[in-house]
């Protein structure tokens, strides 16, 4: 069975996203996607959701 993990990143920057990606993939999670929450008045995302998956048997 496929298991999902969603990590909420409230401080969206290259460094924080890189840290989350490196940390979770080192734990055996596979990167599945990234979604950004935007505010109309700003050009930068206010939040990011990073999605990972792995097989339940790998836990």
Report residues per predicted region.
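Terminus-proximal functional modules
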Residues: 1-59
């Amino acid at each position: 069975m496929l298991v999902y993990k969603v990590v909420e990143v409230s401080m969206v920057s290259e460094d924080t996203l890189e840290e989350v990606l490196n940390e979770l993939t080192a734990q055996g999670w596979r990167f599945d996607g990234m979604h950004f929450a935007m505010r109309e008045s700003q050009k930068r995302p206010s939040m990011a959701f990073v999605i990972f998956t792995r097989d339940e048997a790998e836990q």
